[in-house]
């Protein structure tokens, strides 16, 4: 499932709980890991490769990251999917998060790669959110002093180290 616009912002604000910074109340780490491992297996199959993963995440609002290597994509560049600890959110980036704006991303990523990624995410019940809006200044309920960086963003709130 993909979400953007008004629905995206409503969901981000709904998930924002100042009492639970790294993960929502009741977060089931083992279930999240099984869900992520299933995603990686689907990517490996869909792209006929072995994707790189980063599963050793601590002190962060995201759970893990998987990279589809450039030589397995029609795009010819790495495709990175990072999954949040919140609301089954996932984000797709070209090469590295923050490297391209939405217009560049849309122009560079091959539709066949998008189709495979969307299908794999949908099968895992992830909600794909666009990356670019997440770089907007954070104006949620968590005090700004909690964030390590001087300019907190929605990206940090749900997809980065705190």
Enumerate the predicted regions with their spans:
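Short, extreme N-terminal segment that most often corresponds to the first beta-strand
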Residues: 1-34, 154-162
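Acidic, proline/glycine-rich low-complexity IDRs
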Residues: 102-162
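Alpha-helical protein-protein interaction elements
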Residues: 1, 75-78, 92, 127, ...
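Non-membrane alpha-helical secondary structure
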Residues: 3-7, 31, 35, 58, ...
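Type-3 copper protein
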Residues: 92-96, 100
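Amphipathic, interaction-prone secondary-structure segments
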Residues: 36-90
């Amino acid at each position: 499932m993909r979400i953007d616009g008004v629905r995206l912002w409503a969901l981000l604000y709904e998930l924002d709980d100042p009492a639970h910074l790294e993960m929502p109340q009741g977060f089931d780490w083992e279930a999240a890991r099984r869900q992520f491992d299933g995603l990686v297996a689907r990517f490996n199959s869909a792209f006929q490769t072995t994707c790189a993963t980063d599963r050793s995440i601590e002190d962060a609002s995201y759970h893990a990251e998987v990279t589809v290597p450039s030589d397995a994509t029609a795009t010819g560049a790495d495709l990175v999917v990072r999954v949040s600890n919140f609301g089954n959110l996932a984000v797709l980036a070209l090469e590295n998060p923050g490297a391209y704006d939405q217009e560049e991303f849309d122009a560079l990523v091959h539709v066949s790669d998008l189709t495979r990624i969307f299908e794999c995410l949908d099968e895992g019940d992830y909600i794909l959110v666009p990356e670019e809006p997440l770089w907007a200044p954070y104006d949620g309920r968590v005090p700004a002093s909690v964030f390590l960086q001087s300019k907190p963003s929605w990206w940090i709130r749900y997809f980065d180290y705190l």
